Amino acid sequence: MTILPRHKDVAKSRLKMSNPWHLLAVGFGSGLSPIVPGTMGSLAAIPFWYLMTFLPWQLYSLVVMLGICIGVYLCHQTAKDMGVHDHGSIVWDEFIGMWITLMALPTNDWQWVAAGFVIFRILDMWKPWPIRWFDRNVHGGMGIMIDDIVAGVISAGILYFIGHHWPLGILS
């Protein structure tokens, strides 16, 4: 379904930043960017990821799993409140996708973070198979989340491969 710009403005006007579900769904406002909101949401996820790197990996994983569970609800509810499924302003799914992607970094150097960001954004925007299948066939809050989860898992796999099996020094 194509949404005319005027209708997107109407949908955004239905957001209430005092509603914690809406605030999280739009990535603390990063998804309200008039240009490339998904990219802005992915960038906004990085400082939160950095704070999460101080957690033991088990707790980091638990935070991501809780983020997925909460995200299914908050994305569904926010989309319902806005009257648009998977509105571009809803970027919590990008947060989760980035956190999954960045779990696979061999080191926390900024070059690896940038590589993870670029790989995730390319996959999230391009939506190759199987990402596209999930995007088209799963609906509701899970439908909003799942394509970014799959893009994050694939991005993490690519980063892991590059970091552990590619000739040394490529990104160092």
From Swiss-Prot:
Pfam families: PgpA (PF04608). GO terms for cellular component: plasma membrane. Pathway: Phospholipid metabolism; phosphatidylglycerol biosynthesis; phosphatidylglycerol from CDP-diacylglycerol: step 2/2. The gene is pgpA. Its EC number is 3.1.3.27. Signal peptide: none annotated. One of its GO terms (molecular function) is phosphatidylglycerophosphatase activity. The keyword Metal-binding applies. This is Phosphatidylglycerophosphatase A.
